[in-house]
Every structure is written in structure tokens, then in C-alpha cells.
Amino acid sequence: MNIQIFGTKKCNDTKKAERFFKERDIKFQFIDMKEKGMSKGEFNSVAQANGGLENMVNWDGKDKDLLTLIKYTADEDKLEKVLENPQVIKTPVVRNGKQSTLGYQPDIWKGWD
């Protein structure tokens, strides 16, 4: 397994995801989205596995003005706006090769090889 966890250090679900893999002695790479966001390729891969860009955005987030701006941005510009503002992406994003999840999903992770 090649696990990557994209999240923030303050996010409780990200901390729970890290704990899940540590308890099972599964090595993972943590990527702090405040320091280094996702590349366009990484984002597209995760979005494709999770039902598209709309599902990647945490519409319940704190920055309502930014979320409203993204919501009404033209579809062709939406991806760039989300990549410029990684704080709107649901976390943690956990990747294992082509497989990925959004949020804390231990039942799915247990099935990964």
C-alpha cells in the first residue's frame, strides 16, 4: 500500500485517519494542504474516484463568501478556483494508488490491499 493523507494538522478527521493507519502499522505520507495543495493531476484523479469536483468541496465550510464564489464560478474556471483555495476541499483526502476517499472512512480503508 502507498497511502497518502491530504489534510490539515488541525482537522480532527485527519488526525483520526492518521491514527487509523498508525494503529495498523501502515506507513503513510502526510501532505499538509496549508503548505502544499494538491496538483491538478492528483485532484482530478481523486475527483474522478469520488464523483466529481462538486463532491470534493466542503460546502459546509467556514468561508461562506469563498464557497458562494466557487458555486457561481463558470464550470471551466471552478477547478482553478478550488486548487487556489485548498481550504475548501473536504479532508482528509486519503489515497491508495487509484483508490481514494473523502473524510474519515475506516470501513473502506480496511478493504484496501
Task: List the predicted regions and their residue ranges.
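Local sequence-structure signature of Cys/Sec-based thiol-disulfide redox active-site neighborhoods
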Residues: 1-24, 28-33
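Thiol/selenol-based redox catalytic cores and closely related redox-interacting motifs
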Residues: 33-113
